[in-house]
Amino acid sequence: MRCPFCAHDNSQVKDSRPSEDNTSIRRRRQCEGCGARFTTFERVQLREVVVVKSGERREPFDRSKIEQSVALACRKRPVNQERLDQLVSGIQRQIETMGDAEVASKVIGEMVMEGLRQLDSVAYIRFASVYRDFTEARDFEEFASSVQEMSVHEVSGGE
């Protein structure tokens, strides 16, 4: 593993343990060149997935894009990092277990929307405002009203 401090090619693993959500291995490493210590995370990748964007453009699936989007939507919200990691890991597992080599970005966006809906309603609305391209305050109002109606419907037992 290349050292992030001096770019030396070799490092030694000093400690390995599963992450808190058991979806990755956390490794403490020490650079053989400069002696600096750093942490890496190793995740299982079930299959290579290609994301089909609008306009039929294709790019490799990148977990960090979902992490960044979810983190931005949840910024300054009472949602801890562990919950965010669980959400992103769950979405990644869903994508990889679909069995398809390609997945539409729209499908991923809907998975993120559903995950955020269950996690935090404000984060859900924030993400939706970008994902669904809200252009006016009325768009926010209408969406927020529908979210509130869903919440009331779920609390009342779906009646």
From Swiss-Prot:
Record GO biological process: negative regulation of DNA-templated transcription
Region (Disordered): 1-26
Top-level taxon: Bacteria
Cofactor stoichiometry and binding remark: Binds 1 zinc ion.
GO molecular function: ATP binding; DNA binding; zinc ion binding
Presence of keyword Iron-sulfur: no
ZnF start-end (unnamed): 3-34
Domain spans labelled ATP-cone: 49-139
Record-linked InterPro entries: ATP-cone_dom (IPR005144), NrdR-like_N (IPR055173), RNR_NrdR-like (IPR003796)
Family recorded in the similarity comment: Belongs to the NrdR family.
Entries under NCBIfam families matching the protein: transcriptional regulator NrdR (TIGR00244)
PANTHER family reported in the protein's UniProt record: TRANSCRIPTIONAL REPRESSOR NRDR
Free-text function comment from the UniProt entry: Negatively regulates transcription of bacterial ribonucleotide reductase nrd genes and operons by binding to NrdR-boxes.
Name the UniProt record assigns to this protein: Transcriptional repressor NrdR
Natural source organism: Novosphingobium aromaticivorans (strain ATCC 700278 / DSM 12444 / CCUG 56034 / CIP 105152 / NBRC 16084 / F199)
